[in-house]
Amino acid sequence: MKQSIVTLDMEGVLTPEIWIAVAEKTGIPELSRTTRDEPNYDKLMKSRLKLLAENKLGLPDIQKVICAMGPVPGAREFLDRLREDYEVVILSDTFYEFAHPLMRQLAWPTLFCHSLEIDAAGMVVNYHLRMPEQKREAVKRFKEMNFTVVAAGDSYNDTAMLGEAHAGILFHPPQNVIREFPQYPVTYSFDELRAEIDRAFARVPEIA
């Protein structure tokens, strides 16, 4: 028997974009670039690490900004209700070192993401992917485990996950993503997203 699982992106869906918040707090506008602007994740991360080193910003500086952030208003309630009816996993290209305080505020949902390499001085010197294309690969494995998967995200780095899932949904995407991926329904509120998730699972005989 198939079971239902929802996979969600974190930043831009459940939480604000961490790097945008860091850019605003530190006054370094170049740090505000996200996968919405640069779909090549390795190129984006190398640029971020270079900027952090040039400006002598370490993990404690970033964590200070994150601790002052909270989830998107309504995210906790949305997740709580969603988890009553479906299995829910957050698939994110963030890092455990960043996400911990935000997960606490969301009542510790399951999160698969990446990790950072920190030196003795607290500087971020490298990053380590869980695996290449982890979002898409996770969805593929869930399907192999006989789950019906509905995925939601907001950006370029979510589109492989959306494409691999039985159904994909965009949440607050930028216009360029809407233009390039017109096959996905677009939602702008948690109520709309929940309704679209329910509709997708209602079509299980068609999509699974």
Per-range role (PLM):
Residues 2-115, 119-120:
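Alpha-helical substrate-recognition element adjacent to the catalytic core
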Residues 80, 140, 159-160:
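Alpha-helical segments flanking ligand/cofactor-binding loops in enzyme cores
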Residues 97-149, 180:
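Substrate-recognition "cap/lid" segment bordering the active-site pocket of phosphatases
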Residues 117-121, 190-197:
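A short acidic, often aromatic-flanked loop/helix-cap motif at beta-alpha or helix-coil junctions
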